[in-house]
Amino acid sequence: NNASWCVASKDMSKAVGFTMQKLVVPNTQFACFFANGLKDDAVYHFYNRRLKHNIKEFGELVNMVSPVHIKQGSLVQELASKFVKLDGETEDYTAYGDTLMYAGVKLKQSFSATGYSEDVRLYQDFAARLYFMEEVNADDNA
């Protein structure tokens, strides 16, 4: 149901990771990403591609936070979706290569119908995420 891969540059200073899922399994909020091809003792900046989500993806759940009722498929929903986009999760960490490869990165919890924020992943059916890892100078992080 889930697949991921990671490819690193020849000098192991940069890597790109990709994770995807086929179908959502209810109440499985935990996810961990494991990199590969990194230097064990190098420090890396791990971050994700920032996403914006259309409010249509939330369906009727948008009414939990909307000041007015928005009927699914209505003109109001159509107009609101043109102007309102919700920020996706932010994954931004600094860690050693061996940590990223062997312990992995615990990703933000998945959305479970309530409590959406930048600390929650909206990870629906057939969703995917890109993660970037770049070697940084260890002295810059002190």
Where are these regions (language model features)?
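C-terminal beta-sandwich/jelly-roll accessory domains of carbohydrate-active enzymes
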Residues: 25-142
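Carbohydrate-binding surface patches
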Residues: 1-41
